[in-house]
Every structure is written in C-alpha cells, then in structure tokens.
C-alpha cells in the first residue's frame, strides 16, 4: 500500500473513533502512528477531501466525523450511483445527486455542449439545473440525460 493510501486509511480510522475535537489532536495522533511529516494544513485539506464535519458524539463533545452518507464522490464512482433523481418542467431539467456530486456531473453534462442539446448547467452541492437549447425539446433532452446515467457504469 502506498504511503498516501496508508495515511488516508489511518486518517479515516481516527475519525471513526469520534474523539478528535481539533485538527491539532488529529495531527498528534497521526504523528504517533508514524506519519512524522503531517501538519495542520495537510489535516485541514484531508478533512475537506473526505467531507468531514464537526458534530456532537454520544458524549456530547464536538468532534470531527466522516459523513454517514456516500461521502465525497470521485471520478471513478459510477455515475448512476451518484444520480438520485431526474425530473423536468416545460423549460428545464433538474438532476438531484448525492451530496457533493452535482458539480462533477454538471461538468460532464457541460462537455456534451450544444450539440448534445444542452445550453448550460448550474450546479450546487446536490442539485443541477439543465437548460436545453432552443431547438431541443425538454422531453427529448430529459430522455437523453436519463439514458446517459442509466447506461454508465
């Protein structure tokens, strides 16, 4: 296992203990596990990367914790696992995704461009608005987008 993979696994294992209330406590714990070159800024980046949040544990202490949801999506995640729902009205399509996946999927949709019938997208954390081009009926684009996510693995 690569050193970075070992660090990631150790980091996640520490957060699952739900006892670290500060980044400096995480730094100290990782250093005790043999990761000498770890510092607060690296821990901060890892907390963001893994979607960790501060929440109260069973003892009512504020601690860092990994989300219970799917976690942060990666480019290797199957797209159909990231899309929760697709719906439309007369003018646009709304795609609901797992938390954190909307911008990744919107980027893919934007790459289809006008030739794919997409004028543009707007993405939040878990929602994407898709506007069709003038020449593409929203129902046709809805079908194309749905097929895209059903056929991707």
UniProtKB/Swiss-Prot annotation:
SUPFAM superfamilies: C-terminal domain of arginine repressor, Winged helix' DNA-binding domain. It is found in: Cytoplasm. InterPro entries: Arg_repress (IPR001669), Arg_repress_C (IPR020899), Arg_repress_C_sf (IPR036251), Arg_repress_DNA-bd (IPR020900), WH-like_DNA-bd_sf (IPR036388), WH_DNA-bd_sf (IPR036390). Keywords: Amino-acid biosynthesis, Arginine biosynthesis, Cytoplasm, DNA-binding, Repressor, Transcription, Transcription regulation. GO terms for cellular component: cytoplasm. The keyword Cell cycle does not apply. Belongs to the ArgR family. This is Arginine repressor. Regulates arginine biosynthesis genes. Its main location: cytoplasm. The lineage of its organism: Bacteria, Pseudomonadati, Pseudomonadota, Gammaproteobacteria, Pasteurellales. One of its GO terms (molecular function) is DNA binding. Pathway: Amino-acid biosynthesis; L-arginine biosynthesis [regulation]. Coiled coil: none annotated. It comes from the Bacteria. GO terms for biological process: L-arginine biosynthetic process; protein complex oligomerization; regulation of arginine biosynthetic process.
